[in-house]
Amino acid sequence: ECCRYVDCRRGCTPCC
């Protein structure tokens, strides 16, 4: 599974 989501500039994006 992919790693959890991280807060980016706007919203969230998968760190994988």
Curated annotation (Swiss-Prot):
Q: What is its main location?
A: secreted
List localization entries. Answer: Secreted
Keyword annotations: Disulfide bond, Pyrrolidone carboxylic acid, Secreted, Toxin
The answer to whether UniProt assigns keyword Disulfide bond to this entry is yes
Q: One GO cellular component from the entry?
A: extracellular region
Q: Which Cys pairs are S-S linked? A: C2-C16, C3-C12, C8-C15
UniProt GO MF annotations: toxin activity
Looking at the keywords, is Secreted present? yes
Q: Which residues carry this modification: Pyrrolidone carboxylic acid (Glu)?
A: E1
Tissue specificity statement from the Swiss-Prot or TrEMBL entry: Expressed by the venom duct.
**Comment block on domains:** The cysteine framework is III (CC-C-C-CC).
The family this protein is said to belong to = Belongs to the conotoxin M superfamily.
Task: Please give the name of this protein.
Answer: Conotoxin ar3i
Record organism: Conus araneosus (Cobweb cone)
